Structure formats: C-alpha cells, structure tokens
Amino acid sequence: MSDLFAKLMDQIEMPLDMRRSSAFSSADIIEVKVHSVSRLWEFHFAFAAVLPIATYRELHDRLIRTFEAADIKVTFDIQAAQVDYSDDLLQAYYQEAFEHAPCNSASFKSSFSKLKVTYEDDKLIIAAPGFVNNDHFRNNHLPNLVKQLEAFGFGILTIDMVSDQEMTEHLTKNFVSSRQALVKKAVQDNLEAQKSLEAMMPPVEEATPAPKFDYKERAAKRQAGFEKATITPMIEIETEENRIVFEGMVFDVERKTTRTGRHIINFKMTDYTSSFALQKWAKDDEELRKFDMIAKGAWLRVQGNIETNPFTKSLTMNVQQVKEIVRHERKDLMPEGQKRVELHAHTNMSTMDALPTVESLIDTAAKWGHKAIAITDHANVQSFPHGYHRARKAGIKAIFGLEANIVEDKVPISYEPVDMDLHEATYVVFDVETTGLSAMNNDLIQIAASKMFKGNIVEQFDEFIDPGHPLSAFTTELTGITDKHLQGAKPLVTVLKAFQDFCKDSILVAHNASFDVGFMNANYERHDLPKITQPVIDTLEFARNLYPEYKRHGLGPLTKRFQVSLDHHHMANYDAEATGRLLFIFLKDAREKHGIKNLLQLNTDLVAEDSYKKARIKHATIYVQNQVGLKNMFKLVSLSNIKYFEGVPRIPRTVLDAHREGLLLGTACSDGEVFDAVLTKGIDAAVDLARYYDFIEIMPPAIYQPLVVRELIKDQAGIEQVIRDLIEVGKRAKKPVLATGNVHYLEPEEEIYREIIVRSLGQGAMINRTIGRGEGAQPAPLPKAHFRTTNEMLDEFAFLGKDLAYQVVVQNTQDFADRIEEVEVVKGDLYTPYIDKAEETVAELTYQKAFEIYGNPLPDIIDLRIEKELTSILGNGFAVIYLASQMLVNRSNERGYLVGSRGSVGSSFVATMIGITEVNPMPPHYVCPSCQHSEFITDGSVGSGYDLPNKPCPKCGTPYQKDGQDIPFETFLGFDGDKVPDIDLNFSGDDQPSAHLDVRDIFGDEYAFRAGTVGTVAEKTAYGFVKGYERDYGKFYRDAEVDRLAAGAAGVKRTTGQHPGGIVVIPNYMDVYDFTPVQYPADDVTASWQTTHFNFHDIDENVLKLDILGHDDPTMIRKLQDLSGIDPITIPADDPGVMALFSGTEVLGVTPEQIGTPTGMLGIPEFGTNFVRGMVNETHPTTFAELLQLSGLSHGTDVWLGNAQDLIKEGIATLKTVIGCRDDIMVYLMHAGLEPKMAFTIMERVRKGLWLKISEEERNGYIDAMRENNVPDWYIESCGKIKYMFPKAHAAAYVLMALRVAYFKVHHPIMYYCAYFSIRAKAFELKTMSGGLDAVKARMEDITIKRKNNEATNVENDLFTTLEIVNEMLERGFKFGKLDLYKSDAIEFQIKGDTLIPPFIALEGLGENVAKQIVKARQEGEFLSKMELRKRGGASSTLVEKMDEMGILGNMPEDNQLSLFDDFF
C-alpha cells in the first residue's frame, strides 16, 4: 500500500481489518483529477485484484461521505492486476452496477437488475427474457454496463444476451395477470365512485350513458361504429392499434397553425385509469371551429388510431371522430332542508395535505344545495379571505375554523404526587407489552416490573398473558414474544390482581407512563378492579426536562447514552429493568443539579416553562361563532406561530382557554384526544375529556380504515364499535355528535393527487411512517377523504340505523351551522394609520413646492390640477399614504440615495411636488428657475417636456427649465379619484433595509409587518413528485398521465414567505388582529420581521401597504455620484451625446463591428437587453418621448410583437404614433375629441386585455365614437390585440434613471464601467476578463456556439452579458487588471488610471465573508505563505490554487509540503 493511499484511508477512516486485508496490500493511487469549478475529484486506484463486494461498498460509501462533508463530489475507478470471473463475484458486481448512474435508469434497472449472469468463452452472458433481448437495450444500455464493470476493475468486457424461454413465459404470464388485475381495479374504482348515484339518479335524456366496460366483447364490438363502440380504458393501450374509442376529460389543449395554414390541436385526456395524448388536424379555420368542443374540462368521446408520435416517441391517438358527452356528476339527492353541513374540510392551504381551492369547495357545497360549509385547514386560516368572498357570491354560509394542534402547557413528570422523600421511596418500575396501541382493541401479553429501593432491585414481577388468539407477525417482530412464550400463561385477571398486590406502597414508574398506565387502567376497569391511584413517575418526561439538550429521549437512546444494558428492547422484563437503572441516574442528577429531593418538586421545580415543545399534539377543530371569536381566532393563530411554534404551530390549552370567547370546539379526527381516549383508555376517560368540547366528531368508517392496517382497530366491525362508543361518549357528556367528512379533495378519483403530495414528504413525516420492517414495509394507506354528499354520508353510517344516522349526519350538523353568526373576515373599507395633521402637511408641502417652482399665484393649469388631486387625496383619506411615502423617500434622500418611482404614482402631480417621484405629469412646459414664468404646450404636439428646444425665459433671459410628461391623474386613482393609491418605490438595494426600519420608526413595531406570501407547489415541482412516486412505489406512468398527475398535485401550499419589499402598516388606533393573524416567514422563528398571515393581496384594500423595493439603479447612481462628485439631479435629460447612443456607436469611439452591436445600448438599464436593442435598431428613437414609447412597448404584452412592430414595418404608423403606454390612449383620444370619461374607459378596457371580452354592443359604441372623431382603423385594431400595458409614469421614471447612467458611459466611461461591474454584473471569469481582447472574444464565441446548440448554462449566459461590457471597455482603450492580493477591495472594483482592479468577490467561489477576511488579514501583515493565506485569510485550498494559477500569488511558498487531502480535513 502506497503512502498516499494509506493517507487517504486514514482520512476516510477505513476499517483496519479491511486495510490489512490482502486486497489492499499493493493498493495505490494512480492519478487524481481535481476539477476546481465543479468541485469534482476523480480517483484512479490500482489493486492487485477485484475487491470483495463488501470491501468495495465500504470504500465507496466512506469515500463519498467523507468528501461530501467538504462539499466535494467524488468518483473513482479501479484497475485490477488480476480479475476473478467467478459467478458469485460477477453476479454481486453485476447487481451493484444498477446502483450507479447511468445504469440505475428505471427501465434498465427494473428489466435487468435481477437477471442471472455467467462468464463463458470470454464473455459475460446475461440470461434474459425475450422481450428485453432487443436492440434498444443492446444499443442504449449495455454499453453503460460495460463501462461500469470496467470501473469496478473487470476491464473491458464483452457482454451478450441469450433469451431464456422459460423466464419469458413466466414473466409474460405474470405481466398479463397483473395487467388484468390493474384494469379490473381501475374499472372497479370507477364503478364504486358512481354506484350509489347510478342507483338513485333519474335518467338524463341528453346524457351519454355511463360506459359498460365489457372487455371480453371489446374486439367483437370495435367495428360496430362510433356511436355504439365499446369504450377502451386508456390503461389497456400499450401498442399501436386502430379504431380505438376513448371517453374522458380534456385536461390540456394546445392549438398550433402550420406554415401551410393547417391547424393542429394537441390535447390530452384522462379517463382516470390513465391518460393519453391526442391529435386532431383541421385543414382550415372553418374546420377548426367545428372542434371548439375540444377545450379544457370538456368530456369527450373520441375515436382514432393509436400511433407512435415521431417527435415525442410516445403513443398518441390521431383523432378521426370526436363528440362532446355529458358526464354523470355526483349530486346530493336528499330533498331541500334535509341536506347535511360539512364541518371538517381542508383546502389547498393545508400544507402538503389537501387539494381543493376554497372556491371549489364552496362552489361544490352550493351546487349540492348545502346551506353552509366549514373550512378547517391545518393550523392556519389562510383560506379565510377567499372563502369569505366566495361564500357571499355563492349565497352560502361559510363557517370559519381550523384544525389546531393542542398541547398541554406543562406536561407533568409525576401523576398523583404526594409529599414523599424520593431517596427513601420504594419504586415499582414496570413495562407492558401489548398486541397494539389501543387499550380497548388490543391485548396485554406481558407485564414485568422491578421493585427497587435506593437503586437496588429487591423483587421482580414477570408474567406473560395469553390473549386467546395467535400473535401477529408484526407483534412478534417488534417484541420478540412468540405464541410459545404465552403457552400455559395465567389468566389476565389473575395477573392483574397479582400485579396490584406487587405495587402496593410504591411509586409506579414507567417510560411514557401515559401509555402503560392507560393500558393498565383500561384492563383494571374491564375486570372491575380499582384503577391506579398511587403516584406515578414518567421517566420519558423526567428525561425531557432534566436533559433538554438531548434530541432523543426514547428508552433505546437513553440506555446507550448512560451505558445501561438493554439486551432485548420491547420485552417488558428487560425494558423495566433498564428503566429502573435510568430512574436512579435521573434522581441523582436531579438532586445534585436542581436540588430535587421531594416527589412534589418534580412538577413544580423541574418541569420547564417550554415543556409544551415536547408535549404530544392532539388535534381539535375550532370554529368562529361571532366577530369576537374571529379576533380570538386570529390571536390564537398568531400566538401558535410566533410564541409557541415548535415544528408546527402549537396552542397550549391555557392559551386556548384565555381566548375561547366566541369560539366553538370539536373533537376532530382520530388524532383528537377524545378519540384517542376511546381507543386507549375507555369510555369513562373519554367522557371526562369530552366535557371540554362543544361537540363530538365522528367520521365515515372509511376515514378510520388506516387504523385497521396499523392494528389499532381489528376490523370494520371494530371501527363501527368505536363510532358507537363515541356516540355514547356524547350522550354521557351531553354533547351533540356530528358526522364530518374530513375532506381533503372533492372527487374520489382525486385521491391519487393527495397520495403523491403526501408521499413526497418522505418517511420522516408521521403520516408516511411504515408498518412492519424490512423491504416490504409500506406506509398505511391514506383514507378515502373526498367530499361526500348527504346520501353518501347516510350510507356510510347506515349501520347506526336510519334515525340515528340522520340525526348525526343531517340534523346535528344543521343545528350547529345555525349557531354560527355571519362574520366580516375582510373589512369593506380602507383603514389608514393616523399621522397628526397629515392632510394639512400634504397640502402645505404641495403648495410650498409649487410656489417655489411656478410662482405665487400659480398658473391656472397648475392650480386646477393641484385642487383636483388634493380634493381626491384628502377627501378619501389618502393623505397619510402620500405623507408616509414622502417621509420614507426624504429619509433615503438624506442618506444620499435617489429613490425611483414605480407604477403610476408619477401620474400624480401632488406626488411630484412633495418629493415622492421625479416624474412630472403636467403637459410639456417651460418654467423659469428665476422668475417662475412658464409656458405649457397642451395640444398634444409634444410628447415630453424634455424634448422641447432650449430657449431663454422671455421675461428675464434665464435659460428655461423643461419638464412635463402629459399623464392624466385618472390613471393613478381612477376616474373618480377614489381608487386606493398603490405607491411603489425603488430604493437602493443598499438602503432598502434602512428604509424598512424607517417604517417601524414612523409607525411603531407593533403596527408594521412584512407583507406575507404563500408558496404553493409549482407544476415543475409536482412533476418531480410524480416521478419520485413512480420510483418509490414501483409505478410506471405514460407521459400524459405524468402530466395529468402533476397538474392535479400542483397548487398545494408548501411554505410561506414575504414580499421582497412590501410592508403592511396597521392603523395605530386598531390592532393587527382586526385584519389578519401574524407569523414568521417560512416558520423561521429567528426572522427579524413578522409577516401578515394572510397573503397581502387579500387585505391590500383594507390597510396601507408600502412597496419598498430594492433596485440596482439608485445604487448605481449613488456609486457614480461617489466616484464623480456629480449630482445626478443636474444631469440633463436631453444630452446629445447620450441620445447619440441610440443611433450608433461613434460617440463611444468604436465601430459596431468592434462591440458586436450597431448602437451603444450595452449595459444601459431598460435598453440593454437583446430584445430592446433589436427594437432600437428597428425604430431609431431620437427623443425622450420615443424612449418612453419603447419602454412601454417592451414591457407590454402583445403591444409590440404582432402589433406596433408590424405597423411600423409596413409604414402605417411611426414610433411616435403607435400605442406605447396605457396613458397615451386616454390622452390621444381626448385630443381627438372623445369625452374624458369614455377615453378613460377605453384605456382601462384595452390595458387589461378586455377589449375583445366586453360585449359587442359596448365595443361597437366605443368604435363608433372613435371613428366619429377620426381615430384611424389601424389604431382601433391595435387596441384589440393588447393584453397588458405599461404605465407611462413608470416608463418615465425608468428612462430618466437610464439616461443618467448612460451619461456616465458617454462622458465618464471608466467610472461607468467600475460602477457596472461592482453592482450590475452577475458573473465573472477573471482569467478571461484580464486576459485581453483575444481571450474575451474567444470566450464569447465559445458561449455563442453553445447557445446555438442550447448547451449554454445560466452562468454562461450571465457571463456573456458581462463579457460584452468587458469587450466594449477594452475596445474603448481601457484595461482590465488582475486581482491584486494587496490592492483589490473585498467587494468593489477599483479605478487605477485607465485600469479597473477587480475585487476578491469577483473570483468564482470566493464569498463576501472570505473576501472581507482576506482584506482584514492583509492589514495585519503580509501573507508569507499559501498556508498562512489559508489560515489567516480563510481561503480554501481550491481558491488558493486558483489564485496561484492566475499569477496573483507570485512566488509565494507553500510553507510546508502538505498532502492533497490535508487541506480539506
């Protein structure tokens, strides 16, 4: 073994016995290839022989695991001097190959991994079934197997396959059998879902009869014609076939038009056995219209041929005939007034657990004629706002609730404690073994105990009990107890009496005592024996409170930690003795560390205040009864998320009690404490608990079915008995019993979507805990939790008898709904915070600035505009919104940053005057800065005041200032001026955190919250879930079915977050719970801000929301100001040099060929993208107004492409006259002669893409008015194509910032490039950037080629953008220097004459913290060696190596010779 190899083995801690084996005797490392960018290391090993398979796996796992800890990926291969081709070794390595990519592909692994291999005639022979012995596997997969075996050390093998006829027949038989079973199950599921409906539903004449799946006659009937053809389940189709007929629902449609004018409709259908891709061709528009019925959600019958699509390589139906059919939907058939109310329903806001939107849930209930429905999501109320609005629209009562996680505040260590010296007490430490977790449905099979005094065992008890039936395999596997152990055991009652005698005058002790004591008490009660009344100590809670730093407090982990013997865990005698040994360790530590000497002290002095964090969660349903209850609900949700969050939101019982007014409580599901008590403790215990609640919930037996699989309940009869017991509990406790459905999806066929979502959580989720052990272990099936009709629920509870079933299903649920009052979840008005004298301040600031600019008295046009705006702003209570925005902008300005405006706030002249925006919305005008004389151009002949020619004031000769963008106020606050203002502001990214804190400072911490968001499962993520489900559960879906399942699983809540800049301000005369609960984003309890629990859009018309966004433009401007000393406000908007950038490159001193683009737009905000540069090349803008047009055209949808672009190309219109920004429509139409109200309405219809969606009568009225005022037809047609338009004020703010940046590019280029690379560039490659023009152009060409082949990565695309600017900079005569260990800054680029010095952060892989550490370390002294740079500077070996390669370190010595591995370990 070489020294280098031995060193590696030390690092990965390879076991000594393996290292000393003959296999490792001559081991060596031939080569190590280190890929620094991808952090991949390739090892090439040499061994004397192929390793034993166990040794190989150990080497593989340790090598991977060790390097993963250093964030390094590892691969390795082996060269073996001698190769052993024995069958056993080959077979082992053959199977190992399928654990490595790419041999682990699903199709290859499932088909080949279990086949037998032999080595004959210098070949590896695979005995395979005939159907896999084909060219596909030979050509696509066997070469990968050859490579993998070579990597194992077998050299290059020749592999051949031979067909095994016996295996072929066997597998074919199994396949046919399983396929038939699958088809049978699919059909049966379909029939069951419609069974009750078909029995009771009156015939619908126009409806197509439900298909009768008689598959044996299918072949005979196939030719009978489209109308009478047998319907084929999609799951049956596996090969190309002709004249197949499907019936199903369309879930995806895409229409395309070919170059020849033919149309193709690609669509996907499902019949819920599987899904299929289909195609239908139409020769022209007229034929295409015949197939309008092919629409998403439609139910169709289609006939066609099944063929392999040459592009997708999947089976596709080429449709020949298609017909719309009527689907028999489930209906609630009970008469009016006799329909149930669902009181336990989850929406897609139940995190990763339920599917329906609250709208679809409410719509279904309303469609069925239900008078109310409850919403009870898990631990949140995020569906409340949408539910509130939808219920009001649907005319149905929404009952607002949630399914809460209830915990005890302090979980006691001791039950029934008395005044007793712990040191002098006698303890009976006991444990029971049972056949399951339910004391009512499972049996005791062993009771064992150790009586202990002062740490010594003084007596023992150990008795088996025969339950009267054979033990299940699971019980035997878990406990180690077999039927043999139980032979000859004493009767249960005898053992119980003996154990009671054994326990006298002792403190009982058990680990998780609530279970053991509960089981014992249930059995005592059953045999008329007294329950336990003596003190009990629970060592589980004892450990949790005594050792809170431990993550696990189970008996196994504790015995290991304290070195207590536990030879046979889960046999009662061994567990009891181990628990006793632990008890005395705990007592000693409690006495020495906490002074605990008396039994009473355990609960008073040791139980921690936060013991609720470890308490067992029990579910309860909580319902809002009135408006007081709604606020209390919001408080409970907030407290559970903010103060009591631990893994999930928790509500301690005392907290619930303190906020219970206006709330009603239900006992929830099988995870509720009453249900649990019925199972584990008996009816009496359940009755005591039930008195806490307002009603008892029972659910359909199907909901409880998983408990049978988990052996908590024996069978269906057991489930029905539990339900009867719950009814008895309600009777004794005098609480109504209500049947609820625990709805998680609407239709039975949607069960698979929930299955996929839930299983994606992995086995760490409680719901996915497996039953049994070993490879066959599977999680319990999920219950059938669809939304049931009244008749379906009555059928579920028919075993109770007709009258009782009706009472719990219908009468009691209706009575409960009647107890619920209507509440206002979302307020109808805007509630702004109060700022003293806000109205007076806004008016005063407005006039003060207006007088300063335009003089006093004001010009009429200014005076009237201010009066109009202030009337609206002050009259509607919007002054505080304006003033708050002004205060924030002013504070940022005082810190040295400009603030850019977004959206339409620049449409408000008042906003301009008080400093919220730089955009002046008045008509283009001149104004004298000396005497305030002004001239306004109001005829629409000038698009922007910045485009007016320069001229002096005619009164005093001072050069005029120019301004005005001609934007009507109506585009901000609506025609009537009463729309809630949405003021969005772009702060510097550097100053954004300070601006956020300003909000808190102005309004107070308790009134300012980040705007909350809800993150749901995206379709791409859902697609991954489906593929994972396929892999983990042995499923194989065709592509269309994967798409269907992914669409069905998408949209479920996954997490929460916060808007990047949104701050919600609660009025200071109310509190946040009047509007929304609060929480931390993504459940991060360390976050510095709390967020609204509701998505901020749900309440944005009720409270003030400030959009304080971070943006690069203000940061860039600040950087340029710092570098140049130039105040950006003084930069003219009509600088000729800047405008020259839009027409050529001459102003930059380069040719288009040098920089690869005909204009100077590279790196200019708004105009630097390829798309906008192309627009500039086509339109040649020369004025500010035309730049505004370009900004609007580039940001709109269907405004440029297929619209304005064609009009300009065809010479019909110009850049100046096409529709660019939304506001231009209103201004243009008013200048044309239309009434302002109509002009405004047309603008609103067009900008929202509604022009073609309004009624023909309304649209024709507008068109007639436009034509009467000589609006050209092309303009009217252009309006009809638009889907979305950009506000002109937004465009003006962005263009103004862009021109300021461009000014520096023209006049102060080195400063511009310094700022650009410091702030805007996203990717760097310093070796290329400092390598000169040839290196930069070569790398750009390399990326260009990759782009053409769709091979460029996202990083390379970002790098290309950076290199375009580097190339331009170099062509202009500037230089890009190398990283300098002693001159480079940590983060910012530095200017040295005509050269830019890059910062450390520009080196790939070097983060901000390390960059700052290097700068700090160099200030303390020179780096004398690479090792010192690593240690003091914090740079990794990879970074140091990269610096050395780039020549940054010069001749810096290593300091000492280190192995390749020491740098990482």
From Swiss-Prot:
| Organism per entry | Streptococcus pyogenes serotype M1
GO cellular component terms, semicolon-separated = cytoplasm
A Pfam family of this chain: PHP
* Location of the Exonuclease domain: 427-583
Give the InterPro entries listed for this entry.
DNA_pol3_alpha_NTPase_dom, DNA_pol3_finger, DNA_PolC-like_N_II, DNA_PolC-type_N_I, DnaE2/DnaE/PolC, DNAPol_HHH, DnaQ, Exonuclease_RNaseT/DNA_pol3
Enzyme group, top EC level? transferase
What GO molecular-function term can you cite, just one? DNA-directed DNA polymerase activity
Swiss-Prot/TrEMBL GO biological process terms: DNA-templated DNA replication
> What compartments host this protein?
Cytoplasm
What name appears for this protein in its UniProt entry? DNA polymerase III PolC-type
From the UniProt record, list the reaction(s) this protein catalyses: DNA(n) + a 2'-deoxyribonucleoside 5'-triphosphate = DNA(n+1) + diphosphate
